[in-house]
Amino acid sequence: MAFEPSRYQDPRTWKMTPAMIRARRPFFKKNLLGLGILVSVTGGIYVYTHRFLNRDNDFADVPIPPIDPKELEQLKKEYEQHKRDVAARDE
């Protein structure tokens, strides 16, 4: 048999016996404290990294040139034509 029944588990329900619960009781608070510290450190690193990487100021100093209305219309036409070409190709 691959799994031998443990004397600390009920063989019918596989729940912990009262002896196992008593044996684990002294470590419960320390384990919760350790879990809290681990989750806090991991969460802190995640939040710090997320905030650091999402500073999107790479092009903040690059001025955006004004665009001529005629040029804007031409760009819109090109974009619409590109959308139609992609839609026709995907059909």
UniProtKB/Swiss-Prot annotation:
This protein's GO CC annotations: mitochondrial inner membrane
The principal localisation class reads mitochondrion
- UniProt KW keywords: Membrane, Mitochondrion, Mitochondrion inner membrane, Transmembrane, Transmembrane helix
Biological process annotations from GO? mitochondrial cytochrome c oxidase assembly
Q: Which residues lie on this side of the membrane: Mitochondrial matrix?
A: 1-30
The entry sums up its family as follows: Belongs to the COA3 family.
Its quaternary organisation is: Component of 250-400 kDa complexes called cytochrome oxidase assembly intermediates or COA complexes.
> What is the protein name given in its UniProt record?
Cytochrome c oxidase assembly factor 3, mitochondrial
Species annotation: Lachancea thermotolerans (strain ATCC 56472 / CBS 6340 / NRRL Y-8284)
